From Swiss-Prot:
The gene is P3h4. Keywords: Endoplasmic reticulum, Glycoprotein, Signal. Glycans are attached at N367. The lineage of its organism: Eukaryota, Metazoa, Chordata, Craniata, Vertebrata. It comes from Mus musculus. This is Endoplasmic reticulum protein SC65. Detected in calvaria, cartilage, kidney, ribs, and at lower levels in tail. Detected in proliferating and prehypertrophic chondrocytes in the growth plate of long bones and in mineralizing chondro-osseus bone collar and cortical bone. Detected on osteoblasts in long bones. Detected in skin fibroblasts (at protein level). Detected in fetal ribs, and in tibia and metatarsus from neonates.
Length: 443
């Protein structure tokens, strides 16, 4: 459909609230549906023309459309990723032989049979969802949304439209993924100074559900409420694993084909692009606390659980949490000592060999992330030069075209509050000897 027709369609769109209000990827309003590239392109045109309210309106609409596409992709790929139905297995090769070539031929047929089954499933699924009824956006545009670039324009558009509360939320949302972007940090401090907003009122519009639960668990941990802390930390861990699986599934969406290649190199190109997206899931889902990303986020949750369970006298869970942590940081001397301590007193607590094994979800996550990185390293090492594979690097973010002048920061409102949360602490056990802790009393 031509841009003019889409423009007429959007005349029907009422004033948008928060971009995710009343959202459903199954029942997305038909009057709000249009190509992501069209919505975003129009938003930037309005931005350049200083039509701030119209620009903000289309930027918010584009963010909703991006979420619609992301969630729809994840839904279909998750629902089509189950085990393949049984395929007839040839007893021998095409010439009746049973040698290695025949086995390779049979294995390849089964593999492509599974691929065809999955493709058919995806086609059926996507026919029913609104996101796939409009043209698919370019790859670079999706990367811009992943890096939260639209919020860099949105906060300034809201500011110029005199919507300071929304400007604060948009600027803060951008900084949560780009904490070192000094210009946006300056904007945010300026907005906060005008409204006298504290840290507790800042909202990340793209925050994942596990982030707030994790932060609450850490606060409870630091206050000594270990039981409530473990409950929240377990919930945060489970929610993170769910979001991580959804992110992996979403990486198998449509891909651009920019040139002609032989069959297997073409498949390798598509696979490498999907691999890069899946490896990036771990980074993109890492929470930002006070301007700093939580290093080894999953391992950190197991670290908190290990010490909290120990304080609750649940040594079996403490030992399993320690073993899970060691998957991600096997050289941590403190955790090594903790495991030695648990093993030394295993008879006292009735611990068995299986109590020193990593938890199932930790093992699965570790194996997934490790194998994905190994495969991606392989593509960089062996395929990029030989097959001229284009593994593009993420481009640096452009600045908004209309920066604030120095005069707009003069006088009242020029605040430089730090965003670092004072309560953030590492687990107390880290850096301490396990034997230095008092032994829990058995009841």
């Amino acid at each position: 459909m031509a841009r003019g027709a889409w423009g007429l369609l959007w005349l029907l769109l009422g004033s948008a609230g928060a971009q995710y209000e009343k959202y459903s990827f199954r029942g997305f309003p038909p009057e709000d549906l249009m190509p992501l590239a069209t919505a975003y392109g129009h938003a930037l045109e309005q931005y350049e023309g200083e039509s701030w309210r119209e620009s903000a309106r289309y930027l918010e609409a584009a963010l909703r459309l991006h979420r619609l596409l992301r969630d729809s992709e994840a839904f279909c790929h998750a629902n089509c990723s189950g085990p393949a139905t049984s395929q007839p297995r040839p007893a021998s090769g095409p010439d009746g032989d049973h040698d290695g070539d025949g086995e390779d031929w049979a294995r390849e047929l089964r593999l492509f049979g599974h691929v065809l089954e999955r493709a058919a499933c995806l086609r059926r699924c996507k026919k029913t969802l609104p996101a796939f009824q409009v043209p698919y956006p370019p790859r670079q545009l999706l990367r811009d949304f992943q890096s939260r670039l639209p919020y860099q324009y949105l906060h300034y558009a809201h500011f110029k439209a005199n919507r300071l509360e929304k400007a604060v939320a948009a600027a803060y949302t951008f900084l949560q993924r780009n904490p070192k972007h000094e210009l946006t940090a300056k904007y945010l401090n300026y907005y906060r100074g005008m409204l006298d907003i504290g840290d507790e009122s800042l909202t990340d519009l793209e925050a994942q559900p596990y982030e707030a639960v994790f932060l609450r668990a850490v606060k409870l941990y630091n206050s000594g409420d270990f039981r409530s802390s473990t409950e929240d930390m377990e919930r945060a861990l489970a929610e993170y694993m769910t979001v991580f699986a959804r992110c992996l599934a979403g990486c198998e969406g449509a891909h651009e084909q920019v040139d002609f290649k032989d069959f297997y190199p073409a498949i390798a190109d598509l696979f490498a692009e999907s691999l890069q997206c899946k490896v990036d899931c771990e980074t993109n889902l890492t929470p930002n606390v006070g301007g700093f990303f939580v290093d080894k986020f999953v391992a950190t949750m197991y670290h908190y659980l290990q010490f909290a369970y120990y304080k609750l006298n649940d040594v079996r869970q403490a030992a399993r949490s320690a073993a899970s942590y060691m998957l991600f940081d096997p050289k941590d001397s403190v955790m090594q000592q903790n495991l030695v301590y648990y093993r030394f007193h295993r008879a006292r607590w009735g611990l068995e060999d299986e109590d020193f094994q990593p938890r199932e979800e930790a093992m699965l996550y570790h194996n997934q992330t490790s194998e994905l990185r190994e495969l991606l390293d392989f593509t960089h090492m062996y395929l990029q030069s030989d097959d001229e594979m284009e593994l593009e690097e993420t481009e640096s973010l452009p600045e908004p075209e209309e920066p604030l002048s120095d005069a707009e920061f003069e006088g009242e409102g020029d605040y430089e509050e730090g965003l670092y949360a004072d309560w953030w602490q590492e687990p107390e056990a880290k850096g301490d000897e396990a034997e230095a802790e008092p032994e829990p009393e058995l009841t």
